[in-house]
Amino acid sequence: MAREYPLERYRNIGIMAHIDAGKTTTTERILYYTGKSYKIGEVHDGAATMDWMEQEQERGITITSAATTTFWTAEDATKDPMSDPETLREGQPKHRINIIDTPGHVDFTIEVERSLRVLDGAVAVFDGVAGVEPQSETVWRQADKYKVPRMCFINKLDRTGADFYYCVQSIIDRLGATPLVLYLPIGAESDLQGVVDLVNMRGIVWQAEDLGAKYEFVEIPADLADKAAEYREKLVETAVEQDDDAMEAYLETGEAPDAATLKRLIRKGTMDRAFVPVLCGSAFKNKGVQPLLDAVVDYMPSPLDVPAIKGVLPDTDTEETRPSSDDEPFSALAFKIMNDPFVGSLTFTRIYSGKLSKGQVLNSVKDKKEKIGRMLLMHSNNREDIDEAFAGDIVAIAGMKDTTTGDTLCDPANPIILERMEFPDPVIELSVEPKTKADQEKMGVALNRLAAEDPSFRVSTDHESGQTIIKGMGELHLDILVDRMKREFKVEANVGAPQVAYRESLAREVEVTYTHKKQSGGSGQFGEAKVVVTPGERGQGIIFEDEIKGGNIPREYIPSVEKGMREQAESGYLVGFPIIDFTIRLIDGKYHDVDSSTVAFEITGRGAMREAAERGGIKLLEPIMKVEVVTPEDYLGDVIGDLNSRRGQIQGTDSRGNAQAVEAFVPLANMFGYVNELRSFTQGRAQYTMQFSHYDEVPANVAQEVKEKLA
């Protein structure tokens, strides 16, 4: 089976947005117009094709990012833009679009992060009433981190209170981005009829009857002529800045470049992230989706337009790039694992170079071989078996044994490890206990499966109580995982109240000499270590420095000292939470020819850490959340008063449309159940988002309470 679509006709894009901006609906429409799903699934009917987990359909939010492959033919820019829509697409090459739908809820930013890692471009969807919302900012920053070229679709312009121009301004104010407006809305709110296409200077109007597949080109309405001319001029001026020759020609003649040249310039600026093209419409009312697809083909990068992926060679640690080409050695990144009710475990994989057929590949991170048996192309919830996949493809591989999220798959003869993804540490935890003996075994399997799928979800056992503790990014995150355990794995469990994931930290530098000796006939145990333990910067982790001179502790025992100290730090000192962010300097020690061993030095390390904690003093740290509440003016005082009562530090307020946004740092311990209280004192009119910001010291009186509660 040869490659069907050349690489330059691939588009790997993500659709990202704030919760409720209409992202899944937009994806649904894209699938409908590209002929992938024959009937439109509505989110509020619980029938959207991309949201295929039962809970997503019940809650109406997207939790997992499903990858879907679809196809589209764009217009021919050299033909008369007013000719019939069919004629404009005739004879044009088909493009293959892989869409990754991402969740917009802040508890699932991990999903967004891992999708952005494998995309080449992204479409940010905004709500036409609210403009840029907190989660949109988070996602935007994540996209900046991965240098993803993107464009914006201002959606829901059929809603009462929708304001396209306010949204464009909010892209400048809140994201610090440079919007390049390509379309203006015709009509507003319930009277939205279509859009003005500024590249071709024409109106596009949808005939409402048949789900928006039919539209026609019209002259630009007279009442929009001035506005269209003004925005067209801005568009041309920004576009010609991308190319010196075009700029010169424009300055000399004052004539705008033709449509084909304009598109080329806009494409260049989009890829260089000089600006973000802005489109508009209403996905729900089927208006503006075809121009969005055209823009994806015209302006979003193909795998050849983005820098080649970098990696390191496992043996030598030298850096190497793998260009997007079928002739390069095979390399791919496993970016998501899902359990499929029909196929079992599926590993979603982005192929960066080479081709993949059935047989063996190497997981270079784990250094294990994996067998490729069954490969699938996913169309939201139905699937197509394939025998071969190429550079640029996003495929699902069934039945992999050892591969987890973020692992590299490659050709065993040419191993490489691609850049890994970073996953945040969880900030909230709760205990789960199986209801019956039968549930006990199933629960272990279920939790391991869920943890393999989601790297921001961790499972551990409390050594003292024997309870199983699950940790995640927020209440909703853990809620959904417990719910999935019940539905998918039929495990009934009692769930404890959510607990804060506190941390411990050293109060001051301390020098400790610890000797472990056990003599009792025969071979004994002996180890001595002298260490200096110093509190570090927040977020530095544990740093171990070996400063042993002259072999006072033999080389082979030094890792044991480090291991013992790290393990002891993990189990904490004050109330059993990990001690974080400090530096250990191992400066001296002693050993015995017969009695010393790796085990003896590990015990020495543990003892040294215990003593360092005891003598250096321990402070309790708590996770501080960045909270943003958007509330009507009337409740502003109540909201601020309430946040203050939760030990919050107000950072500022600013007006957003007709509402006020309050930003504050609040300890997570004081935010449980906030959603219900906020709802009750604002009559459900305020909403909030929160995300982890940093760890900070717990005030003495609160620390005392925590100790008593947890002791």
Curated annotation (Swiss-Prot):
Molecular function (Gene Ontology), one example: translation elongation factor activity
Gene Ontology BP terms: ribosome disassembly
PROSITE patterns per record: G_TR_1, G_TR_2
Residue numbers binding GTP: 17-24, 101-105, 155-158
GO CC aspect terms: cytoplasm
Keywords on record: Cytoplasm, Elongation factor, GTP-binding, Nucleotide-binding, Protein biosynthesis
Presence of the UniProt keyword S-adenosyl-L-methionine in the record: no
Signal peptide annotation: none
tr-type G domain boundaries: 8-304
Coiled coil: none
Compartment annotation: Cytoplasm
Protein task: Catalyzes the GTP-dependent ribosomal translocation step during translation elongation. During this step, the ribosome changes from the pre-translocational (PRE) to the post-translocational (POST) state as the newly formed A-site-bound peptidyl-tRNA and P-site-bound deacylated tRNA move to the P and E sites, respectively. Catalyzes the coordinated movement of the two tRNA molecules, the mRNA and conformational changes in the ribosome.
Family: Belongs to the TRAFAC class translation factor GTPase superfamily. Classic translation factor GTPase family. EF-G/EF-2 subfamily.
Record protein name field: Elongation factor G
Organism field: Erythrobacter litoralis (strain HTCC2594)
UniProt gene name: fusA
